[in-house]
Amino acid sequence: TTTIKAKKALSVGNELIKKIADNTHSLESNILKNTTIAISCGDAIRGIENPILKTNFKDLFTSLNRNLEIAGSINNKKFIIEAKKTAYNNTLLYDLGEIKDAKFDFYEPLLANSIKLGYANQDYDDLNGRDEFNNTSEFKAPITRVNKLYDLTAPYRADMFGVEFTRINLQGKTTTDNNSDNDVFMLDVEYDFTDADGIENYKLRRPAFTSITGLIDPPSAFNIDLSPKRIFNKHGAWIRGMMWPLTTEKITFQTTDKNPLLKTVQGGVTIQENADVVISDLEPNYFIPITAKFETIVPENLVDIMQSNSTGLFQFTHNGDTYKGWVIACSQKPSTDVEQQWTLLLSADNNINKLIHA
């Protein structure tokens, strides 16, 4: 058994925010407080004394978003990170009334016909490394309107063989002569005990799956809950929104660098890394990838409305039908009553059958 130093994701984030803001802001996050993800580095895994975790907030946020699907906001000198679904609040903020002329169109920045997710592929000097499942996986979507990649890869690693090879092959060496020394690793952990010095100790999480196949040594495996297919599922609501209205179609698995065969069953739920995905099996989508553009007079208290709930919905009526959406863009000239341009992203509960004409 090897003990390595690691930090909680919330602790790393808070340190980075304070450094960026010169101690004027802090990080608040229930999702990071409760996550099982800890952050370590190559030097810590090797057992180097006083290891330094070299990272930045962009890499931290991008990596945590990959695994947790998060969104960030600022409020009263606090940077807040929570689940992305909280940014798609269905609370109605304001009814803009009847709109004379509205233009509806697909919002292409939210469309993609291929999906890449997971972790940078690694080269190992060991044949067993081919069993690694936390690599980059690629999927093909049925969309033909665009030729674009949706990228859910990020810098932090979670490959168990990378952790093990770093620990076993280099443990106790005092020089920083390995490619993984400065790499940042995610570890899926659970609380174990608090020692006499008051330091919390954690152990690697190894969930009790009903069945697990596709690995050489399943009992020793870890970081399974950080796998690419689980990343896919975590972003399921967003991906389903991107694919609208192709709910009966499939997103097909294409390739991965090493092991595509990992399959687990737990609580009646099967997760297979190389399985295709029926879009309708994903979580309900937050949005429809359609924008409504129109001009109307902006309410005088628009700023107050937006500050009260920056993630709420605006509503309008067009040709007798009511629509709701989140603000992508709007402008305000308080000194005039001139109509201003609005752009809303439609929420998933809109009925837009009348708009589908091609």
What is the meaning of each model-derived region?
Residues 265-305:
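Autoprocessing Asn-cyclization modules and mimics
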